[in-house]
């Protein structure tokens, strides 16, 4: 890619990246991105990004560089894309508290969500998740909301999930909220 192509690719994103350098909030939502351009990471290289919103794009993967470069992330919104997997590097986001991966193409919960030590809000609604490994422990002791609405959870798994003792609020379809209080 020559310099002119890089500049053309970056023009609409440059003001957003400059604003993020000042605020710590990178908002690239609804930018018609099919990839997160590497030049974004170059511009943001010395910035401390605490929040990143790349929702409403056309992404089918998240570059591992996001997790490697944005170690201070507390909030990541990757909803409304075409994602089915996440890079393993995302499991190393030590400060991540809120992860929104709703309205994507996930058939299973990515293993990394169980490894995030400070995760308190996980939004995974409107995917294609039918079940996941209930024996895998959630590393975070701060989990507050786990939203699985509008997923085709199979009935036997749903029963196991509802009966599993949790300290967090489990949200499932219109049937209500389960495990809202410690039992």
Region spans (language model):
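Extended, charged alpha-helical interaction scaffolds
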Residues: 100-101, 107, 113-129
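Tandem repeat domain/solenoid detector
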Residues: 82-84, 88, 92-97, 105, ...
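The feature captures the LRR N-terminal capping module
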Residues: 1-79, 85-88, 98, 130-183
């Amino acid at each position: 890619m020559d310099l002119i192509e890089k500049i053309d690719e970056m023009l609409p994103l440059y003001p957003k990246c400059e604003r993020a350098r000042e605020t710590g909030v990178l908002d690239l939502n609804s930018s018609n991105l099919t990839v997160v351009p590497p030049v974004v990471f170059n511009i943001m290289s010395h910035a401390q990004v605490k929040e990143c919103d790349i929702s409403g794009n056309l992404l089918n993967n998240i570059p591992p560089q996001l997790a490697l470069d944005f170690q201070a992330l507390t909030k990541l919104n990757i909803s409304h894309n075409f994602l089915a997997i996440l890079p393993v590097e995302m499991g190393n986001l030590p400060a991540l508290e809120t992860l929104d991966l709703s309205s994507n193409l996930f058939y299973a919960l990515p293993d990394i969500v169980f490894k995030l030590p400070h995760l308190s809000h996980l939004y995974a609604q409107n995917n294609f998740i039918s079940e996941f490994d209930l024996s895998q422990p959630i590393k975070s002791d701060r989990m507050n909301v786990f939203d699985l609405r509008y997923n085709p959870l199979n009935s036997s798994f749903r029963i196991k999930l509802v009966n599993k003792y949790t300290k967090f609020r489990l949200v499932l379809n219109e049937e209500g909220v389960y495990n809202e209080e410690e039992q």
